């Protein structure tokens, strides 16, 4: 029986059941008595619990069944009259074994366990009837010594030696046994222990009363009889005998704040003065207002000639005189001289002038574009001079540039460079788009292939299902045929169909065994969907039963 499965309410009987299990192989009779004692304890527990203890019936019945089995094994060895003597002798034997080992100084954990087993055996003995004082004393001693040895082992300390027995002080008749002497010695030691405990209690009471009396007497005559050390007194200013009193360190004295003497300021402690901050300026006084830095004012375009010195100087450009000047001599001297072309026919001159006009238009277009770009970017503008209109002069007439046409101004517009970069970016973008389209087409193709594979697999699964259905139908037909044939065989009638039966054939035992074997093979073949093998085995089975081939 598994003791761990017992309910908690039956925990007190577990030690006795353990002893019973340990003694089954060595002493079945003592194991039986321990189990009977456990059953009696369980019945008492159930009776005390009343209706709530009904769940204990099942484990109690199991213990009873095991006790009945032991009782059947014992048979005539059970003797109700001598059972108490047997249990007492067994308990005394266990007690003496543990006590001998203990007094020899060999106490260990097994010694503690043996003392505890003897204690349990003494409990079994007490429930069988009245016991002697010797049994009661040994029961108590076994319980105490078991706990004492176990506690010492747990604490890592050597067990204390057992109480000694003085053989010279043993009294009584000469026929007194050694165990009786030990019990008397134990009684004497117990009495001595009680006496010492009582004496200690009396001494404690006397000590408490004496302390109360002494405290009262001390409180009454403290000044006369006892002298306690006094705390040092504060020195008196008028006392001239300073040597008798203890001196304490003097703290620095601070002058009183109400002293009217001007000279006392010298004795005061000097504290650091805080720096004085200037007072903020008043709003009424305009001169004391904070001054801010003045930035230089920009010259106005209508400034007089006297302010020209303050204006920023810019690099001077070559000045051209206006063509409308009244002084013809000065104009001839100031204007640049250009080489004159030789006179030619009017037809050649018109062709050349038309070419010059086209080139001039190209130059003007390019200059306009450059001006638009320059106006879009932020560059400093030069100040306009309203007095001298030299920079606003009209361009010279076209006939003055006939000799050297401004071919050097022909430049390819910078937009072509940007257009080339844009074209490269567009080409790259188109290539990326083409690659993406290719990858998308590949993915579509792969998806289509996967879909085709899935459809093919689905078709294969459908075909397999159809084949399975056909096989199942064939199996059902075969099973029906077999059942019909078995019915015909059982009824003793002739075989139907193409089967020929010999009614006079009586199968032997070997034929029956072979037929049974092949019929089992029919069932196993049908389980694995092997229809041909099932048909073959069925025919062989019928052959052994009927004696003829089908």
Swiss-Prot record:
Annotated compartments: Cytoplasm; Endosome membrane
Alphabetical UniProt keywords: Cytoplasm, Endosome, Membrane, Protein transport, Transport
Pfam family membership, one: Vta1
Cited function: Involved in the endosomal multivesicular bodies (MVB) pathway. MVBs contain intraluminal vesicles (ILVs) that are generated by invagination and scission from the limiting membrane of the endosome and are delivered to lysosomes enabling degradation of membrane proteins. Thought to be a cofactor of VPS4, which catalyzes the disassembly of membrane-associated ESCRT-III.
Membrane topology: Peripheral membrane protein
The protein's name: Vacuolar protein sorting-associated protein VTA1 homolog
Amino acid composition bias (Polar residues), ranges on this chain: 340-349, 429-450
Primary subcellular site in the record, as a coarse category: cytoplasm
Keyword Lyase part of the UniProt annotation: no
The keyword Cytoplasm belongs to this UniProt entry's keyword annotation: yes
Gene3D superfamilies assigned to the protein according to its UniProt record, in alphabetical order: Immunoglobulin FC, subunit C, Vacuolar protein sorting-associated protein vta1
Family: Belongs to the VTA1 family.
InterPro entries named among the record's database cross-references: Vta1-like (IPR044538), Vta1/CALS_N (IPR039431), Vta1/CALS_N_sf (IPR023175), Vta1_C (IPR041212)
């Amino acid at each position: 029986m598994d003791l761990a499965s017992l309910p908690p309410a039956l925990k007190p009987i577990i030690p006795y059941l353990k002893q019973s299990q340990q003694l089954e192989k060595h002493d079945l009779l003592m194991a039986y008595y321990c189990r009977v004692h456990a059953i009696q304890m369980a019945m008492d527990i159930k009776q005390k619990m009343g209706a709530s203890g009904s769940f204990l019936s099942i484990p109690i019945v199991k213990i009873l069944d095991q006790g009945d089995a032991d009782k059947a094994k014992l048979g005539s060895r059970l003797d109700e009259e001598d059972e108490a003597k047997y249990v007492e002798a067994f308990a005394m034997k266990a007690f003496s074994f543990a006590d001998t080992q203990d007094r020899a100084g060999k106490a260990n954990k097994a010694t503690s366990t043996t003392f505890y087993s003897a204690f349990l055996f003494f409990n079994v003995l007490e429930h069988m009837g009245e016991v002697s004082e010797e049994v009661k004393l040994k029961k108590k001693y076994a319980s105490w010594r078991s706990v004492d040895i176990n506690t010492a082992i747990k604490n890592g300390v050597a067990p204390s030696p057992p109480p000694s027995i003085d053989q010279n002080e043993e009294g009584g008749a000469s026929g007194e046994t050694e165990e009786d002497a030990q019990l008397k010695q134990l009684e004497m030691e117990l009495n001595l222990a009680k006496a010492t405990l009582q004496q200690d209690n009396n001494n404690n009471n006397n000590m408490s009363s004496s302390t109360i009396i002494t405290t009262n007497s001390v409180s009454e005559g403290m000044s006369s009889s006892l002298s306690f050390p006094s705390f040092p007194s504060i020195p008196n200013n008028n006392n001239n005998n300073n040597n008798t009193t203890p001196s304490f360190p003097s703290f620095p004295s601070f002058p009183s704040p109400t002293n009217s003497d001007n000279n006392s300021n010298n004795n005061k402690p000097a504290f650091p003065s805080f720096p004085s901050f200037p007072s903020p300026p008043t709003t009424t006084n305009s001169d004391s207002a904070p001054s801010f830095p003045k930035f230089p004012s920009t010259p106005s375009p209508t400034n007089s000639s006297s302010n020209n010195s303050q204006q920023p100087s810019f690099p001077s450009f070559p000045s051209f005189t206006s063509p409308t000047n009244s002084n013809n001599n000065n104009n001839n001297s100031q204007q640049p001289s250009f080489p004159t072309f030789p006179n030619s026919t009017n037809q050649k001159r018109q062709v050349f002038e038309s070419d010059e006009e086209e080139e001039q238009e190209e130059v003007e277009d390019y200059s306009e574009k450059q001006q638009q770009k320059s106006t879009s970017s932020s560059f400093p503008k030069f100040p306009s001079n309203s007095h001298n209109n030299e920079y606003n002069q009209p361009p010279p007439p076209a006939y003055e540039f006939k000799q050297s046409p401004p071919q050097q101004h022909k430049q390819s517009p910078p937009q072509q460079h940007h257009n080339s970069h844009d074209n490269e970016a567009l080409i790259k973008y188109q290539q990326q788009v083409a690659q993406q389209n290719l990858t998308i087409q590949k993915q579509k193709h792969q998806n289509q292939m996967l879909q085709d594979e899935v459809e093919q697999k689905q078709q294969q699964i459908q075909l397999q299902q159809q084949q399975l259905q056909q096989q199942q139908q064939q199996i059902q037909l075969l099973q029906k045929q077999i059942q019909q044939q078995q019915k015909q065989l059982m009824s003793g009638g002739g075989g139907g169909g193409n089967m020929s039966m010999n009614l006079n054939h009586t199968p032997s035992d070997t034929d029956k065994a072979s037929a049974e074997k092949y019929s089992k093979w029919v069932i196993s073949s049908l389980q694995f969907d092997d229809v041909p093998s099932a048909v073959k085995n069925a025919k062989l089975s019928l052959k052994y039963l009927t004696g003829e081939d089908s």
